[in-house]
Amino acid sequence: MIPLLTPFFTARMAQNKTPKYKNVLLIRFSAIGDVAMTVPVIQSLAVSYPDVHFTVLSNVRFAPFFSQMPGNVSFMGVDLKKDYHGFGAMFKLFRQLRKKHFDAVADLHGVLRTTALSVFYRLSFTKVKRINKDRRSRKRITRQKNKDLTPRLTSFDRYRIVLEKLGFRFEVSFRSIFGGGKGNLSSISNIVGAKDCPWIGVAPFAAHKGKIYPLYLMEEVVAQLDSAGVCRQFVFAYGREIAQVQAWADKYRSVEIIDNRLGMGGELILMSHMEVMLAMDSSNMHLASLTGTPVVSIWGATHPAAGFMGWGQNPDDCIQIDLPCRPCSIYGKKECMYGDYRCLTGIDPDTVFTKVKKYL
């Protein structure tokens, strides 16, 4: 390098490592799995930039995700359905946010509500960067002919790219929401008791039918695990789902249904003490991944290539079968074109059992 230019380039390099912004707003309202996927990125960001304060704006019920964050991360919870419904309500929220004097905004959601907030901030001369969901590329995954199953950027990558556009350079290095350890089991021991044998989690439900392994097949897996000597199978079910799996608890000694008794924070603690979680492509897949627990996941209408695998999940633990019609949906909302959901009914319970058993 030319000696006279050395101070110039050295100064520029130092400037690139120094954050331009000191008070940054990060926005992701929903859904639960997508918000969970921000956690590894935000924690890594906060550790890399301890002199910058980050505020996470999200649904109030997702606060437990951020309770173990570094001290330079704050959580601001809102109830959109109750308090901020409609465009006018977004302006009301913006006026409240302005009091916190953010000098940059990262929109990690990219929906109408966050677009409105982004516009308000840009009109007030605040730097805003927004997520690129690359919807056009994802459509090539689900088209009926010549499906392109090249792995897309993960959501973790897309979140990091937004922050890089604001000048934050960092690697996403994350182990668990509880750091290097596990959650405080004594805080929920009055419900789950002490651990004296292998624990596994079973999360048989998802938001859409195209993502749910048929319950009669899942029961075969539960029965095999019970016969194999697993002493505790915690089955995650809520509301109307409970009645659909109550018979399992009555029939198999190892099965215990986990409903809303623990709350999200308690469920994260419980998951951190499990040997493995068996889940669909669902929020529980992501929650368990945040605790560092291995996850065996079942994929039907959706596909890992879309970029929504859990953090640190082993691709070999994604159970799926190859069909010309699969995947047919990015989010699993689409009904089966044949009506039989063969992408799920074709998965052998023995295959699922074998994948889970290797962790016991």
Predicted ranges, named:
Residues 1-360:
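Catalytic machinery of carbohydrate-active enzymes
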